[in-house]
Amino acid sequence: TVMITKTALENIVSKQRKMLANVSPGHPREIEESIPYLTDRMLLIGGVRGCGRSALLHRMLNNDYPEAWYTDFDDPRLGGFDAGDFTKLDRLLEESGKGIALFNRIDLAAGWIEFCDRKIRQGIKIVSTVSLETLLRLAKAERPDGTGAVPDIFSLRRLDLFSYNEFLSFTHKPAGEQAVNEFLSRGAFPGLIKTGHTEALHQLYTEILCKDAVIAGGIRDRNTLQRMALHLITNTGEPVTANK
């Protein structure tokens, strides 16, 4: 793995923040009413891909913590981020003088728990989105890689897909049978409801398969996995056997 330089990291972080300035912060979510004030515990928000984690973090950055540090680890330019890179991020965060840090998918980086534990002890308040798998493991006090226990520094929140009420609010539709049928037909993924395009569903499927299954799971035979996934999707509700 080629280690990123401090200057390159600083440039990437700066560009990420500038890109956010041109993106809508998204629709209000019900979970916002129950998100606690930041304390000496790191706030982790987890959920399935496509549930709106990044958009929620953007809303928090835009509405609640506009002066906070921000880094998006779900960025190809930060692929392979590890403990050595966290040392550079540590310096940049310290030089910025910021006391609050918001991270998107920090769990994609190796050594993130140790970094966050250190920053929390230094008084930095942290919010980050994580995968649902990471959230569930931490809820059982297990490390995401299964290597042992984790420090007791986390406050966990789960973000679900759009509820029926969120769907009504987003689409500005009155409650009723027609709205229920449309909700069941269009689904509850915020991004898909927003665009209404089939291509968005295909993109989400590809990301789940490639990023969450192939890459994260270390699966080498991508083609077979794609065929299996397609078979399961097209035969939902039907009995499936290992040799079928």
Language model feature labels by segment:
Residues 102-103, 125-131:
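Structural recognition of the conserved hydrophobic beta-strand(s) that form the central parallel beta-sheet
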Residues 134-154:
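Short regulatory helix/loop adjacent to the ATP-binding pocket of P-loop NTPases
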Residues 69-96:
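Short glycine-rich substrate-engagement loop in P-loop NTPases that contacts/grips substrate
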Residues 56:
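Hydrophobic positions on the alpha1 helix immediately C-terminal to the Walker A/P-loop
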Residues 2-34:
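N-terminal pre-Walker A segment at the start of P-loop NTPase domains
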Residues 93-112:
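Conserved P-loop NTPase "ATPase switch" module shared by AAA+ and STAND
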Residues 2-15, 158-244:
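Interdomain hinge/linker elements that couple catalytic modules in large macromolecular machines
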Residues 53:
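Conserved lysine of the Walker
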